[in-house]
Amino acid sequence: MAATFATPSTVIGLGGSSITTKPFSSSFLKPTLSAKNPLRLAGASGGRVTCFERNWLRRDLNVVGFGLIGWLAPSSIPAINGKSLTGLFFDSIGTELAHFPTPPALTSQFWLWLVTWHLGLFLCLTFGQIGFKGRTEDYF
């Protein structure tokens, strides 16, 4: 019985298969291209293996400058009881610094102005980055 397991045997149809494989093709698919691994491209990033391109942040100071101006202009309009959001925020900073070692109370208006002002600033910077980079890279 041990001899039957030790002898090489082939399953009919698999051992000596003469079936040739043809690449899958369809009229719905583009012509087949060999997929290239970007990590294996010679000299793609100076011989180092990276998963992201080196300039992934795509930092541009135009976005920061225009975004800050784009937020300071509307937040400086006196729309809240004759005062602007920027003015209220900076005034609340001054009143909280008047008693400096003591932190602002949780009921202080400082927290409302801080969160509102920075939320508007970060939204303006985010949309500015999307719009500026989308325009320079021809997304729209």
Swiss-Prot record:
Disulfide-bond pairs as recorded: none
Ranges facing Stromal side: 52-60, 131-140
Membrane side Lumenal, thylakoid: residue ranges: 82-109
Taxonomy, superkingdom: Eukaryota
Entries under InterPro entries matching the protein: PSI_PsaO (IPR017498)
UniProt topology in membrane: Multi-pass membrane protein
Subcellular locations according to the entry: Plastid, Chloroplast thylakoid membrane
Transit peptide location on this chain: 1-51
UniProt KW keywords: Chloroplast, Membrane, Photosynthesis, Photosystem I, Plastid, Thylakoid, Transit peptide, Transmembrane, Transmembrane helix
Pfam family, one: PsaO_TMD
Keyword Transport in record: no
Listed GO MF terms: mRNA binding
Gene Ontology biological process terms from the UniProt entry: photosynthesis, light harvesting in photosystem I; photosynthetic electron transport chain
UniProt GO cellular component terms: chloroplast; chloroplast thylakoid membrane; extracellular region; photosystem I; thylakoid
Disruption outcome: Reduction by 50 percent in state transitions due to a disturbed balancing of excitation energy between the two photosystems. Short flowering delay.
Transmembrane segments: 61-81, 110-130
Known partners and oligomeric status: Component of the photosystem I (PSI) complex. Interacts directly with PSAL.
Primary role: Involved in the balancing of excitation energy between the two photosystems I (PSI) and II (PSII).
Family assignment from sequence similarity: Belongs to the PSAO family.
Name of the protein: Photosystem I subunit O
Organism (species): Arabidopsis thaliana (Mouse-ear cress)
